[in-house]
C-alpha cells in the first residue's frame, strides 16, 4: 500500500510539473510584448500583430498588439468595452488604470475575459479568452497566469 501511495504521488507530481512546463512563450517583438500560451491551445492563425489559438472544448484565445495612434489607452479600452456590449456581452467586471485594464462578461453561456497593458508609450498588448461558463473554476488559475505573463518587453 505505501508503494501505491508513493507511486501515485510521484505520478501526480510529475504530471503537474510537465503541465507547468507546457506553457508556450509567444511575443511580438516589434510591438513590445510577450505572453505565455496555456497548454492545450493550438495556433490557428498568425499575423504580424498577433495570433489566435483554439483551446480545449472550443475555448478561443487571441493575443495581439495595437498601436494606439491618437487615442489614449483608456479611450481604446472603453471603446472595446462598448463594442463588446453592442455585440451582446453583459460586462460584469471592469477595471481601467493608466497602465493596464481588465474586463469580463458573459454571453450565450460563454465567459469573455480581456486584459490589456500599455507598452512602449503609444502601443498596447491585449489578450481575449472565451470559454464556457461551466468551466469557470478550472479556467480561473489559467486566466490568472495569463494575466501575469502579459508583459512589455523590448521597448
Enumerate the language-model features and the residues they cover.
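Positively charged n-region of N-terminal signal peptides that target proteins for export
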Residues: 1-4
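Bacterial N-terminal signal peptides
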Residues: 7-16
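General secretory precursor processing signal
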Residues: 17-18, 123
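Short, solvent-exposed mixed-charge patches
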Residues: 21, 154-155
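N-terminal "mature-domain start" segment
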Residues: 21-44
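Conserved polar/disulfide-associated segments of primarily extracytoplasmic proteins
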Residues: 43-141
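C-terminal partner/receptor-binding element of secreted or periplasmic proteins
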Residues: 137-149, 155
Amino acid at each position: 500500500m505505501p508503494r501505491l501511495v508513493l507511486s501515485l504521488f510521484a505520478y501526480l507530481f510529475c504530471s503537474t510539473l510537465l503541465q507547468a512546463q507546457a506553457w508556450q512563450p509567444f511575443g511580438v517583438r516589434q510591438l513590445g510584448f510577450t505572453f505565455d500560451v496555456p497548454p492545450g491551445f493550438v495556433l490557428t492563425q498568425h499575423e504580424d500583430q498577433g495570433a489566435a489559438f483554439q483551446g480545449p472544448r472550443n475555448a478561443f484565445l487571441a493575443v495581439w498588439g495595437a498601436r494606439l495612434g491618437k487615442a489614449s489607452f483608456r479611450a481604446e479600452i472603453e471603446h472595446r468595452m462598448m463594442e463588446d456590449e453592442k455585440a451582446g456581452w453583459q460586462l460584469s467586471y471592469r477595471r481601467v488604470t493608466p497602465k493596464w485594464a481588465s474586463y469580463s462578461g458573459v454571453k450565450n453561456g460563454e465567459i469573455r475575459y480581456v486584459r490589456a497593458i500599455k507598452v512602449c508609450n503609444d502601443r498596447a498588448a491585449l489578450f481575449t479568452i472565451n470559454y464556457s461558463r461551466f468551466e469557470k473554476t478550472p479556467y480561473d488559475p489559467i486566466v490568472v497566469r495569463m494575466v501575469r505573463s502579459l508583459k512589455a518587453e523590448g521597448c
